[in-house]
């Protein structure tokens, strides 16, 4: 495992600054992608994450995960901020944009590569699908490219992706994690972990669909020798066919609800009821919900899954 002292001074200082922030108290975050309007599932996660931070008298940051630029939609950043304001969910400090932190991610990538922690991988998604586990199970990368010659990709005239050699304890839960994609984009796990550590995030509250990402992120944190982040997961909202709500499926956002005449207290009440925080039919603002939960110790934590 790499030690923090092996990181370049400027990265070590960023890690130390993040740790100091964590030591000061609870710090949570909400990290949507600007790929379209937030649907009710996104907003439910935002509400629960905000409540968890405010119940702890902590900070709640808004981070925009906009690295995958071809998928970003014009106006989505402004829209998601307006939706959060409309629901009464306030954040602390300026909005953090991942697209403005590429240099930091690449510095961590270079440091890990110099330490011999990475290797080039030529596996495509199709190749991995051919060796994947049965449908519905998470694929653990089998290490196909671990022992390939380092520069195979350039010899073949194409760029590789770069994977992290995880320690034995994570080999059966995450496998070797992609940190940079073959198209040159920094991978989700690297950007997310670097942000959690350098922004001082102490606990991540996110949708249950991201539970599969936890082991990969813990494996990377382990290699950087940082104190693990606490992960909590919110049960997913599903449509009447049992499918999780998704932007690509066109599931309802706030615009359609507002057009029906529903106000913030209706939506907050419904979202809270969907997590058994209040009875269905309750109408209350985010601030009123927070006040109610302060009287009911442990109710919110009972909703969250590790």
UniProtKB/Swiss-Prot annotation:
Pfam families: tRNA-synt_1c. Zn(2+) binds at residues 121, 123, 141, 145. Its cofactor is Zn(2+). L-glutamate binds at residues 29-33, 65, 188, 206. It is an enzyme of class 6 (ligase). Coiled coil: none annotated. Transmembrane segments: none annotated. A motif ('HIGH' region) lies at residues 32-42. A motif ('KMSKS' region) lies at residues 244-248. Binds 1 zinc ion per subunit. It comes from the Bacteria. GO terms for molecular function: ATP binding; glutamate-tRNA ligase activity; zinc ion binding. Belongs to the class-I aminoacyl-tRNA synthetase family. GluQ subfamily. NCBIfam families: PRK05710.1-3. Catalyzes the tRNA-independent activation of glutamate in presence of ATP and the subsequent transfer of glutamate onto a tRNA(Asp). Glutamate is transferred on the 2-amino-5-(4,5-dihydroxy-2-cyclopenten-1-yl) moiety of the queuosine in the wobble position of the QUC anticodon. This is Glutamyl-Q tRNA(Asp) synthetase. The gene is gluQ.
């Amino acid at each position: 495992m790499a030690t923090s002292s092996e990181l370049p001074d400027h990265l070590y200082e960023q890690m130390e600054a993040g740790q100091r922030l964590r030591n000061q108290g609870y710090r949570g975050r909400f990290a949507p992608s600007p790929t379209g309007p937030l649907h009710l599932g996104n907003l439910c996660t935002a509400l629960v994450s905000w409540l968890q931070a405010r119940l702890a008298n902590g900070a709640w940051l808004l981070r925009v995960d906009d690295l995958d630029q071809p998928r970003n939609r014009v106006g989505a950043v402004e829209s998601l901020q307006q939706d959060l304001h409309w629901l009464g969910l306030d954040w602390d400090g300026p909005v953090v944009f991942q697209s403005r932190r590429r240099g930091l991610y690449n510095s961590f990538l270079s440091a890990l590569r110099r330490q011999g922690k990475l290797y080039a991988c030529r596996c495509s998604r199709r190749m991995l699908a051919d060796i994947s586990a049965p449908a519905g199970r998470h694929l653990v990368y089998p290490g196909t490219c671990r022992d390939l010659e380092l520069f195979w990709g350039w010899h073949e005239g194409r760029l590789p992706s770069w994977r992290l050699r995880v320690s034995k304890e994570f080999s059966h839960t995450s496998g070797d994690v992609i940190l940079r994609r073959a198209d040159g984009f920094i991978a989700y796990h690297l950007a997310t972990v670097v942000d959690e550590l350098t922004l001082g995030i102490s606990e991540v509250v996110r949708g249950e669909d991201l539970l599969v990402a936890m082991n990969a992120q813990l494996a990377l944190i382990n290699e950087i020798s940082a104190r693990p982040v606490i992960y909590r997961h919110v049960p997913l909202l599903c449509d009447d066919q049992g499918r999780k709500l998704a932007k690509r499926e066109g599931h309802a956002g706030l615009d359609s609800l507002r057009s029906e005449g529903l106000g913030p207290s209706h939506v907050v009440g419904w979202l809270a009821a969907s997590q058994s925080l209040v009875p269905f039919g309750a109408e209350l603002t985010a601030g009123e919900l927070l006040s109610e939960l302060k009287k009911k110790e442990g109710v919110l934590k009972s909703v969250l899954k590790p």
